[in-house]
Amino acid sequence: PPPPPPQQFPQFHVRSGLQIKKNAIIDDYKVTSQVLGLGINGKVLQIFSKKTQEKFALKMLQDCPKARREVELHWRASQCPHIVRIVDVYENLYAGRKCLLIVMECLDGGELFSRIQDRGDQAFTEREASEIMKSIGEAIQYLHSINIAHRDVKPENLLYTSKRPKAILKLTDFGFAKETTSHNSLTTPCYTPYYVAPEVLGPEKYDKSCDMWSLGVIMYILLCGYPPFYSNHGLAISPGMKTRIRMGQYEFPNPEWSEVSEEVKMLIRNLLKTEPTQRMTITEFMNHPWIMQSTKVPQTPLHTSRVLKEDKERWEDVKEEMTSALATMRVDYEQIKIKKIEDASNPLLLKRRKKARALEAAALAH
């Protein structure tokens, strides 16, 4: 029999509908004032299940359509082993305001790069970098396969489940997540447009490509300890740095990169492409030998842990720069999408395109 066709994505089953509980959260959990972290939209507190005494994390959001969307998308993604799991969601009144209370598994292992920085003498290797990128890639692959772009993949949103060596790395904070299927797509049951500009059907590419850029930056830092784009003046994000990001100006300086193969540098180049539509997709990334066959990746010792230790006081700036770069990118891509859709529905442009295609077809016919 012929081999089965290759599947683009493993078939994931999406979690069944989210049931929001209306009873008071304090019926079921003991809420403490211990702050675990600050999410994009609010603090995260430590809480304990009254039934099992197990520890969980609680995120509080003021109820509004944006908060509902965050909860809904995070809930759908919550099946993935590399995404922080939502356990319960409550709608309660708090200080007279309607709030959504999200109970999540507690990730006690700290941030990705703190863990690498705190290593003793054993070197961090290229193979470990590949394994880490694979687990982050699995989270993104899951999201993209169910048409969600996270749009805020950055170091502080990557946390370990525990301090143990075998801990699992998970992606958190869905405050900027976005559904990428265009519901108002141009194809209706009785009308399939004969020709549609690819930019009208492909705006979701932009949102997803934001995640791919993040993968490139994180992979770069994993391999050397510093980011590809940084501001020279110690400002959070300088005009010069914005230009470098836009122009894709970065290097692979020695000694940190001298032992890293050309193939790996090429993978980073394909993730950091300045034109979002040319960036590698998550499927291509997951199929790359460096990711797919991480057991074959050489155990080259890297400079990462030493550089992170030496630049410890710069790390807050690095995080701020990435936060800022992602914010700029989200705004830019929204504007590009709007402009492309306007261009695509501009009758004069459409006429010119039609003419050009007719000429092209005629030329091919000869």
From Swiss-Prot:
Residues with the Phosphothreonine modification: T188, T300
Motif extent (Bipartite nuclear localization signal 1): 337-340
Active site, per annotation: D152 (proton acceptor)
Chain residue ranges for the region called p38 MAPK-binding site: 332-356
Post-translational modification remark: Sumoylation inhibits the protein kinase activity.
Span list, region Autoinhibitory helix: 294-330
Binding site for staurosporine: E105, C106, L107
Enzyme class: transferase
Compartment(s): Cytoplasm; Nucleus
Catalysis performed (reactions): L-seryl-[protein] + ATP = O-phospho-L-seryl-[protein] + ADP + H(+); L-threonyl-[protein] + ATP = O-phospho-L-threonyl-[protein] + ADP + H(+)
UniProt-listed InterPro entries: Kinase-like_dom_sf, MAPKAPK_C, Prot_kinase_dom, Protein_kinase_ATP_BS, Ser/Thr_kinase_AS
Keyword Phosphoprotein: yes
Reported regulation of activity: Activated following phosphorylation by p38-alpha/MAPK14 following various stresses. Inhibited following sumoylation. Specifically inhibited by pyrrolopyridine inhibitors.
Residue numbers covered by motif Bipartite nuclear localization signal 2: 351-355
SUPFAM superfamilies, per the entry: Protein kinase-like (PK-like)
Domain of life: Eukaryota
GO BP annotations, alphabetical order: 3'-UTR-mediated mRNA stabilization; DNA damage response; inflammatory response; macropinocytosis; regulation of interleukin-6 production; regulation of tumor necrosis factor production; response to cytokine; response to lipopolysaccharide
Assembly description: Heterodimer with p38-alpha/MAPK14; this heterodimer forms a stable complex: molecules are positioned 'face to face' so that the ATP-binding sites of both kinases are at the heterodimer interface. Interacts with PHC2. Interacts with HSF1.
Family designation: Belongs to the protein kinase superfamily. CAMK Ser/Thr protein kinase family.
Protein name: MAP kinase-activated protein kinase 2
Source organism: Oryctolagus cuniculus
Organism placement in taxonomy: Eukaryota, Metazoa, Chordata, Craniata, Vertebrata
